[in-house]
């Protein structure tokens, strides 16, 4: 059974057609890239999947169940997590606490337990801290656990946001331009990290990214959008060699590394 099935999805903002007739099926443990120019509708699709925007028409099924009309928090509980173009962190909190907060909606103790500091509270807090540190280690951030998030370099903030998404224990991870603002060394590390996340956590990944070197190296399939419609889909090599796609949506004379 596919993990995500989107059929004939459309979204209108008044008279503006942001997404038209978008269809996509994701199988378990795939890494699929969603590419296209700014304003093509990529992030709008993420917002439709996660319930931030209501759908104008079409269907979205996650693990065989319709998620249309569900509030974002319920969609998150089902197992869909995402990152954002503009990093969303608790900037005044520590790196560790940024991850710990994601676990707290699923804690196994009550208010009285925390007030009295009983054994169940202590054990659960220790488990949350240990799990958070494991995720920070995966992101190469364990040595910065006590730093304030605002003081992290930009690339580290990106990785912290991914750690927060993973703390929700998702089955589907939506990454919105994770390489934005990273230097070439950080981008290379990110490519390996995305593969590791898929393999280690057994997660399906849908990725929006403008850096073609990233999507060509890490994605198994690519879907190209323009003006809210799919204009090409296929293997990275097929997209790489599609002259129309390169000229119309990546710019004339672009060479994909």
Go through each PLM region and give its residues.
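Glycine-rich phosphate-binding loops of nucleotide-dependent enzymes
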Residues: 1-257
